[in-house]
Amino acid sequence: MHLSELTHPNQLHGLSIAQLTQIAAQIRDKHLETVAATGGHLGPGLGVVELTLALYQTLDLEKDRVVWDVGHQAYPHKMLTGRYNNFHTLRQKGGIAGYLNRRESPFDHFGAGHASTSISAALGMAIARDLKGENFKVVAIIGDGALTGGMALEAINHAGHLPHTNLMVVLNDNEMSISPNVGAIPRYLNKIRLSPQVQFITDNLEEQFKHIPFFGENLTPEMQRLKEGMKRLAVPKVGAVFEELGFTYVGPVDGHNLEELIATFQHAHTIPGPVLVHVATVKGKGYAIAEKDQVGYHAQNPFDLVTGKAKPSSKPKPPSYSKVFGETLTKLAENDPRIVGITAAMATGTGLDILQKRVPKQYIDVGIAEQHAVTMAAGMATQGMRPVAAIYSTFLQRAYDQIVHDVCIQKLPVFFCMDRAGIVGADGPTHQGMYDIAYLRCLPNMVLMAPKDEAELQRMIVTGINYTDGPIALRYPRGNGYGVALMEEGWEPLEIGKGELLRSGEDLLLVAYGSMVYPAMQVAEILKEHGMSAAVINARFAKPLDTELILPLAKQIGRVVTLEEGCLMGGFGSAVLEALQEADILVPVLRLGVPDILVEHASPDESKADLGLTPPQMAETIMQKFGVPQRATVVTAS
């Protein structure tokens, strides 16, 4: 059977090991071919090909439920559930999403983009099943470090207290999140994986049973039960932590041995109550380059399959905001032992890998544990340290109570650095950094700032380090800067709450925040061509606003436009409106930003065009709102 003929996962039932092996090879080929062309997550999906095939052969997905954690592990799942022929559209506008999406397929039983949610969701399904008197299996697949997340442990704690609720948790243990796993739980799992007794039983017992004449080949499920029993005799502590928490522990099992996996899952389905199946996999399996560099090939931009190297761009690009952040913070940390960079399993993505290499004592990776990261930072701040919590905008949402309760109420000087703020592109709605302005602006004692370019980012990093009167948050976008000159040292901090007037004008006031400042300057140029004179303010701070700069100009000019790369509800434009209202300045205001919608996966440029946030589109919207001279011809987006 060719994978293109498979439209339903139940077609896997009854296929031989040889046929499944052939399909596994087709999945890997398609996975590699597609990600090399479109970009996307590479290593996670390659590591779960056999796991997915074996599990789905033992389930009836007409009724059974499968919940994948994180979602980027699930590329093989997508190919096996009717999306193989469209898989080439992965992460492209209008194509297959890079994460699970209930709107995309009835087999995506629960959406996921963030980590550690699967066990909670699966347990909810299992409890609902039992309350309704229904009968189907529920399986959660958790991996890529997600078991280090507190929510996963909360769910395990709850599920273990429900001995009559049938639930299978498959632990895809590849020893990695994006970076290598950290913490006591991964260390415990490694002890199980590396136990000589367990390895001997796993590697040798099955082969010995196969040599029993006549019926050795047919003993697979029973053999699996015997292997589990012998592991417990040889190593009584195997899986003890999970057993003490109320789960029946099964494993570890070779995650790339189809025969052993099928037997293990068949055996696990017969065990009543919560069951945890520990599957040892290799991230990037089947692509030697990815197996060797599991961090670098967790996710990739388009690359050459033969060399593994990124496809060259037409011209050299300026450094990314993440790199500028990492380099600048590291230089400051080298001269200030109070500075500590904190990441939640995202060292490379945030640029803190630079700090990790050069000043390792001032670097902490807490694993996928944003809540812990924030409160730990708060504790460090009480002792005079300068904690810098470098967390993507979308992931900082996970620690909201800690920001409120442990940081803001106590007015502790924690410096939040939010990478990927704004439109992120192909990762889609689970990863868009749309909401941080709104969800942080409402908090007492919080200061918010955003740079117009990478040079201003450097100054804001120094500003955040120097600010000790409470928490301060810095947002900056995904991608490369503008190529402006950068200083190696001697950065001057900014005055809190002070913006800058970049351009004078008489007809219109553009007040832009962060990544929208340069586009605002382009808008002003377009408007100039149509006879409109626009002043441009780089706000720098969303809280506190520079009302001394904004309000007099708003009153004088009489027409205001705000520009932000974030949600309009409660965002930067709302802050300007509130300031105008409180000052009794009643002038027309146009807010440009992201409306009350989910921004689906597409390139950042495509998303901005869809939202009307390209400079020509914004200029057209402004002229439609406020009117233009009769001689004007509106410039539209091509």
From Swiss-Prot:
Pathway: Metabolic intermediate biosynthesis; 1-deoxy-D-xylulose 5-phosphate biosynthesis; 1-deoxy-D-xylulose 5-phosphate from D-glyceraldehyde 3-phosphate and pyruvate: step 1/1. InterPro entries: Dxylulose-5-P_synthase, THDP-binding, Transketo_C/PFOR_II, Transketolase-like_Pyr-bd, Transketolase_BS, Transketolase_C, Transketolase_CS. One of its GO terms (cellular component) is cytosol. CDD domains: TPP_DXS, TPP_PYR_DXS_TK_like. Binds 1 Mg(2+) ion per subunit. One of its GO terms (biological process) is isopentenyl diphosphate biosynthetic process, methylerythritol 4-phosphate pathway. Pfam families: DXP_synthase_N, Transket_pyr, Transketolase_C. One of its GO terms (molecular function) is 1-deoxy-D-xylulose-5-phosphate synthase activity. Mg(2+) binds at D144, N174. The keyword Metal-binding applies. Its cofactor is Mg(2+); thiamine diphosphate. Thiamine diphosphate binds at H72, G113, H114, A115, G145, A146, N174, Y287, E370. It catalyses: D-glyceraldehyde 3-phosphate + pyruvate + H(+) = 1-deoxy-D-xylulose 5-phosphate + CO2. Its EC number is 2.2.1.7. Keywords: Isoprene biosynthesis, Magnesium, Metal-binding, Thiamine biosynthesis, Thiamine pyrophosphate, Transferase. HAMAP family: DXP_synth. Belongs to the transketolase family. DXPS subfamily. Homodimer. Catalyzes the acyloin condensation reaction between C atoms 2 and 3 of pyruvate and glyceraldehyde 3-phosphate to yield 1-deoxy-D-xylulose-5-phosphate (DXP). This is 1-deoxy-D-xylulose-5-phosphate synthase. It comes from Thermosynechococcus vestitus (strain NIES-2133 / IAM M-273 / BP-1). The lineage of its organism: Bacteria, Bacillati, Cyanobacteriota, Cyanophyceae, Acaryochloridales.
